[in-house]
Amino acid sequence: MMIRDTRPKTSLLRGLTITLLGLALLSPAAYSADKVSLTLYNGQHKEVGDELAKAFEAKTGIHVNVRKGSSNQLASQVVEEGDRSPADVIYTEESPPLNKLGEQGLLAKIDASTLDVLPKDYVGSNGDWMGVTARTRVVAFNPKLIAEKDLPKSVLDFAGPEWQGKVGFVPTSGAFQEQAVAIIKLHGREAAEEWLTGLRAFGKVYSNNMVALKAVENGEVATVLVNNYYWFALKKEKTNLDSQLHYFTDGDAGGLITVSSAAALKSSKHPKEAQQLLAFMASEEGQRVITNTSAEYPLRKGMESNRGLKPFSELQPPKVTPADLGNAEEALELERDVGLN
C-alpha cells in the first residue's frame, strides 16, 4: 500500500530550502568567501615576491595578492592612501622607504617573537620594520681591462680624474643612494658631495644595475658599483663570466651592507595574518625561499647562504646600520644639488 505524504506543500518546500542552504554553507565556495586574503605591496624583485607568496599560501592556506612597483613608488602610494590602503604588508628592496613610513606612524609594531630571530642591527629602531635579507655593495670589474690590485682602496677614490670613463654607477638605485648616506655619516656631507660630483664628472651613468653589470661584462667599462647579487643573477644566465667581484674591506663605505625590508601597515584589515606573513619571511623556510630565488644573505640568526656567496662573517662593512641610513632624503638632495637627479 502506498503511503501518501500528507504534509502541506509549503512545509516540504521550506525543508528543501533549508537542506539546500545547508549544503551551500558546506561547499568550498562558502569557505573561500570567509577566507582571509592578504595584499602585499612588493618593491622587491618580482620573482622573489611571487615565490614568497606562493610558499606562504602553501604553508598557511592564506592567499596573497602581490602588487608590484618600485619601493619608493609603493611607499608614496601608502602615504597617499592612508587608512584606505588595501595593503597589509609592504616589502621593499631597501630600508629607507620603510624608515619614511615609520616616521609618519603608518607601520604596526612587529611581533617580538619575529624580531628576536633577526640581528638587532637589521631591524627598525622602533620595531616597526625588519630586514629580511642582506646584500653588500661591491665593485664588479673586468680583469681584461683592469687588474684587481689596481682597484682603489676606498670607494671615495673613484671620484678622481684618473677614473675618467672607467667607472659606472646607477644614481637612481636605492642602494647607491644608501651608499651616499653612509658616506655622509662616516665622512660628512662635503665628502659625499665631492664623491657624487666626481662620479658625475668622470663616471658613466647607467639606467639600472643589470645594464651597468652587462657593460662591464661586455668590456664597455672597466668597473661598476653594484650590489653583489646582480652578478650572481647574471651568472645564472651565463655560466662563465668575464667579470669578477671586488669587496672593499676595513669598514669602507664601498662595502656597505643594505637590506631588503618588510613591515605590516597599521591600517591592515588583517593584522594577525599580516604578522604571520612577516614571521614566515623571517622563518628558516621563508628565508630559504627568498635566497634560493635571489642570491642574497639570509638574515635569520644561524643561517648561511647556499649560493656560493662570500661568507657574511667575512664581510667588513662600515659601522652604519640600516636604521642609521634613515629615509635617504639627504642623498636625494645631494644628487639634485650636483645634477644627478
Give the location of each predicted region.
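Short amphipathic alpha-helical coupling segments at ligand-binding clamshell hinges
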Residues: 52, 62, 191-195, 260, ...
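A ligand-binding cleft/hinge motif common to bilobed small-molecule-binding domains
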Residues: 96-100, 222-243
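Early extracytoplasmic/lumenal segment of secretory-pathway proteins
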Residues: 33-99, 341
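Extracytoplasmic ligand-binding site segments that recognize negatively charged/polar headgroups
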Residues: 43-47, 69, 73, 85-221, ...
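A bilobed periplasmic-binding-protein/Venus flytrap-type ligand-binding module shared by bacterial periplasmic
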Residues: 140-145, 184, 257-270, 289
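Bacterial N-terminal signal peptides
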Residues: 15-27
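Periplasmic-binding protein-like
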Residues: 163-171, 280-303
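An extracytoplasmic/periplasmic, membrane-proximal ligand-sensing/linker region
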Residues: 296-341
